[in-house]
Amino acid sequence: MPQFDPSSFPSQIVWLVIALVAMYFVMSRLAIPRLAEVLEQRQRLINDDLKQAEALKAETEAAIAAYETALAEARARAHDEIRAVTEAAAKAAEARNAEVAKALNTRIKDGEARIVQARDEALTHVREVAGAVASDIVGKLAGLRVDDAALTAAVAAAIKE
């Protein structure tokens, strides 16, 4: 093998140095700057993405805060409207109950008046019937004829007891 022949070592070392120097210049002038440029570009993109993410995060937090504020205001308005509607409904129900109670009281008073009137009519008829029955009983049992004024007074006294 010629690579292991010691007489060819100096020429191999020269070519090794030439190849390494050529590779060094190619790498230092072409490959490494391109790699450095790619790495810098990648780092710039990462930094830009991070800045954009921070800006979007801040914007999102502001939007969330605005949303929560709007939601709290909407809840407060809804509670106020519900309370107002509830109060209005309670007032309307109270007014309706008052109207119904007034109508019922009027009907009750009318009914009581009719009952009193019917009772008074019944009592007057009872007095007349009681007077007629008492007159007939006294006439049939005792065979006497009783004065109508005395008979009416006796029936009135008996009804009062």
Swiss-Prot record:
The keyword Membrane applies. The keyword Cytoplasm does not apply. One of its GO terms (molecular function) is proton-transporting ATP synthase activity, rotational mechanism. Keywords: ATP synthesis, CF(0), Hydrogen ion transport, Ion transport, Membrane, Transmembrane, Transmembrane helix, Transport. GO terms for cellular component: plasma membrane; plasma membrane-derived chromatophore membrane; proton-transporting ATP synthase complex. It is a single-pass membrane protein. InterPro entries: ATP_synth_b/b'su_bac/chlpt (IPR002146), ATP_synthase_B_chain (IPR050059). It comes from the Bacteria. The chain crosses the membrane at residues 13-33. It holds the Pfam family ATP-synt_B. It is found in: Cellular chromatophore membrane. GO terms for biological process: pyruvate decarboxylation to acetyl-CoA. CDD domains: ATP-synt_Fo_b. Its main location: membrane. F(1)F(0) ATP synthase produces ATP from ADP in the presence of a proton or sodium gradient. F-type ATPases consist of two structural domains, F(1) containing the extramembraneous catalytic core and F(0) containing the membrane proton channel, linked together by a central stalk and a peripheral stalk. During catalysis, ATP synthesis in the catalytic domain of F(1) is coupled via a rotary mechanism of the central stalk subunits to proton translocation. Component of the F(0) channel, it forms part of the peripheral stalk, linking F(1) to F(0). The b'-subunit is a diverged and duplicated form of b found in plants and photosynthetic bacteria. F-type ATPases have 2 components, F(1) - the catalytic core - and F(0) - the membrane proton channel. F(1) has five subunits: alpha(3), beta(3), gamma(1), delta(1), epsilon(1). F(0) has four main subunits: a(1), b(1), b'(1) and c(10-14). The alpha and beta chains form an alternating ring which encloses part of the gamma chain. F(1) is attached to F(0) by a central stalk formed by the gamma and epsilon chains, while a peripheral stalk is formed by the delta, b and b' chains. Belongs to the ATPase B chain family. This is ATP synthase subunit b'. The lineage of its organism: Bacteria, Pseudomonadati, Pseudomonadota, Alphaproteobacteria, Rhodospirillales. The gene is atpF2.
